Amino acid sequence: MKFVNCYNKLEIDRINDLVKTNPLLAKSEIEKYLAKYPNYDWGYVMQANILIVLGEVQKANEVLNALEEKVKSNKRLSKELRELYISKITYLRLRILAYNRNYDILYNFFSKNTEFITKEKLATEWLYTRIVTGNLNGEKLPGYLANQIANYNEVYFKNHIQKHFGVKTQDNSVFSENFPLEKVLEHLPNYLEQPGLFYDYFTDKYIFKLDGCGFASGIDTDLFEVITIHGTDHIINMYPTLEGTYTNSIDLNPILNKGYSRKISQIDKFNQRYKR
């Protein structure tokens, strides 16, 4: 997410990176940062975004309300900077509407604010909003995701992920030959009842752990991502990932691997050997 001048750019860059790799840690780190630099207003934009990713939308709205009041009352802000803040606050409030599935309100806003769609590059979100509210007016559905949002089909999903069962290369994500796809799909709905990580407007993201599940960018990994249509258990994509620092990954090993025992890290081995 774009940000304005900050007190410690390296720290802000690190937090921005954490939003994708470990949003729970990003939440903690931005709180610490704002405790040190409470006047860094863009930090509250970042904080609200992180809270939305984690599904804490009520807290996010409180942060945005306080920030909006502060921005509007700050007479020293330039017109350009004030407009930037208001634009980002609006963008995040729209994501809260999407998280709560208030799609009719979202549609009404987009239909009356086409310049905002262009400015924030939300043409795809505007299309999906028209789909879920039944306002396509005869438009053709372009692409896999649009069709799945309009009319979910599990067979299409299974066909779509076949590309992740091909030959391993340095650039792709592929599951291992013995990945138990059907068993995984049988158990996944049990973990999809609550929304996952919410990075956009219409999908949830979950991270699952299964030892030896596949490869990402040519590197072995025990983790894979599952993407669903927001608020449903309709899976639209899944693939191995290297984003292994998620603290809320879901471990499937005890269920799918009979006789499973946790892998012992080198640190654990050292501690066991020299424990006194």
Please report, for each region that a protein language model flagged, where it lies by residue.
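Alpha-helical segment of the N-proximal tetratricopeptide repeat
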Residues: N5-K32, K36
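Start-of-helix register in tetratricopeptide repeats
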Residues: K9, W42, L81-L84, K88
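Structural motif corresponding to the intra-repeat A-B loop/turn of tetratricopeptide repeats
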Residues: K20-T21, L54, N100
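Alpha-helical repeat scaffolds
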Residues: L25-E31, Q58-K70, N102-T114
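Residue-level recognition of tetratricopeptide repeat
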Residues: Y40, N74, K119-E120
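Functional cores of ribonucleases/endoribonucleases
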Residues: Y128-R276
